[in-house]
Amino acid sequence: MSDKYMKNLTFANIAKACEGRYIGDETLLDTTITGAVIDSRQVKEGYLFIPIKGERVDGHKFIPTVFEQGAAIVLSEHELTDPAGPYVLVESTTDAMKKLAAFYRKSLDIKVVGITGSVGKTSTKEMISSVLEQKYSVHKTAGNFNNEIGLPLTIFGIRESHQAAVLEMGISDFGEMHRLSTMSCPDVMVITNIGYCHLEFLGDRDGVLKAKTECFEHMMPDAVAVLNADDDKLATVQTVNGKPAIYYGKESASDVHKSVYTTNIENLGFDGMKAHFVTPEGEFDAHIHIPGEHNVYNAMAAAAVGLQLGLTIAEIKSGIEKAETIAGRTNFIKTHGMTVIDDCYNANPVSMKSSIEVLSHAKGRTIAVLGDMGELGSDEKKLHHEVGEAVGENHIHTLFAAGELAKEYAAGAAEKSSDVDIHYFEDRETMTQELLSYVKEGDTILVKASHFVEFPKVVEALSE
């Protein structure tokens, strides 16, 4: 079957997988769909349209339109009057979509790598994909399509020609990982770290560990877990489903036995990192062209996954050295004689400190422009204060901070260093105006905050 079609997703199998009732021309039951979407604007000839009930819009109202656009079949939560094509009646289109994604994934002969963790999911996904692409045709999560709506859509993008899929899985509460991993059924499951994310819902890091490791229950029978040995919580996981966990980390950072580890780590500032990698299959030196020590960890995870999926040392090294940044994730923008480090897609304490460390290697004035971090629970002030301390400890020249909790950045920075030029503002707009009059040629400016603070607007202002 060509890549035009979604293998095994006939009308009959769709109805069966969704636990729904097929209503329409019975002679079409063996028809195979060509795609599956929830956005009516993306419907093409032969597609399945899945109408989702949103807060503002109910996708069911677009059913007549999508049939005109060439949709082959739709799902629906209620019986349709004189529909222009067949449909499957289901109790919940959202639940039906998840069931269909799980069915489709299991019907494919493909190796699936799942990735989760408090920090570094997307950058690790990119590194692993870069490595696997040296041997396989790879499908990967686009953008941040990593939740209970995004993951099934990512799975629907897999075609028969793909040999590996790298799927990012993001959660904020208990039970979500159960549902995500039921759909993805990983052959290799990577957990990057257990940090201070979503503590409003998960309580503490032990809660984060419990929620993240729900994925172990839904891995494929011969699956392996690839874990960061230098994370104290993950280091307590000795076996997964009766098999030893595969660990990676720095040679001297912890006592856990590591299958993949690094020595001779060299920070090249904005030119990236160099490290010596030791694996069961051999050793190699690699130049990672993305700044930040955290990218050495991403590369170790990618090496461990590559070995599990049969890549050679040469292929792994090549993939690590070809990896690139993506927009909004430590992206470097040259503008008006300045360098803007656009890292404002999201933020948490660990990623904040990593980005500040990257900034510290810049020449000229270093300016940290920081906004609030969300979902940190009762420790939110303390965790913001610690990020401020990192600004002082890394000898950052200037701090611009905006937001209610960002006061703690200013306090922490002042506590650690009297040399930091500190500017605090209650709102982003006022801060941006002051920042524009402050910056000059030769400055390097880090812009970082949680997504809800809308700091991409700061990057836009600096770039205009």
Segments from the language model and where they lie:
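ATP-dependent carboxylate/acyl-activation modules
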Residues: 115, 121, 327-329, 452-458
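Phosphate-binding loop of NTP-binding sites
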Residues: 12-16, 96-229, 233-243, 306, ...
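Acidic, Mg2+-coordinating active-site environments of NTP-dependent enzymes
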Residues: 17-18, 76, 80-84, 190-340, ...
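Active-site beta-alpha connecting loops in nucleotide-dependent enzymes
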Residues: 56, 326, 344, 348-417
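Residue-level signal for inorganic ion chemistry
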Residues: 14, 47, 66, 100, ...
